[in-house]
């Protein structure tokens, strides 16, 4: 639902920028948070 979609839309420079819902942390290739 909402958390994974939110993760993929959130820009990040490191895993610390991503919420606990973003189980894959920061996807550096895309510069966005991601889920597993």
Swiss-Prot record:
The modification 4-hydroxyproline is found at residues 3-4. InterPro entries: Toxin_Pg (IPR026210). Expressed by the venom duct. Keywords: Disulfide bond, Hydroxylation, Secreted, Toxin. Disulfide bonds join 7-22, 12-26, 18-33. GO terms for cellular component: extracellular region. The keyword Cell inner membrane does not apply. Its main location: secreted. GO terms for molecular function: toxin activity. It is found in: Secreted. The keyword Iron does not apply. Belongs to the Pg turripeptide superfamily. The cysteine framework is IX (C-C-C-C-C-C). This is Turripeptide gsp9b.
């Amino acid at each position: 639902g909402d958390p994974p979609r939110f993760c993929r839309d959130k820009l990040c420079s490191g895993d610390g920028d991503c919420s606990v819902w973003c189980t894959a942390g920061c996807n550096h290739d895309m510069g966005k948070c991601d889920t597993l």
